[in-house]
């Protein structure tokens, strides 16, 4: 019985250490993502067409196709979005189109995915 208790205590300790390690890594990823900056989109410089862009910040990977018509962003299609729990961030494309800017707020609870989507759009339009 004593051996069983020792094993249980060791397992609990390992689970706690694993959880704390995961939390530290997740916090580091979020803090790294929050310091990224975005270029301002000059709609006067946008040429009509469809542009592909990609961005990856662990654990999120995004590919987009951005459509420009009459110098305005008219559509952003998410071709790929490996997101973990960041699916709610996909609505950020509507904000980008509405404001014609990457200077839009991240979706709460999906910060890393929001930033990755904005960076992929930036890549599609500016090649960054």
Residue spans of the language-model regions?
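Intrinsically disordered terminal and processing segments
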Residues: 1-63, 67-128
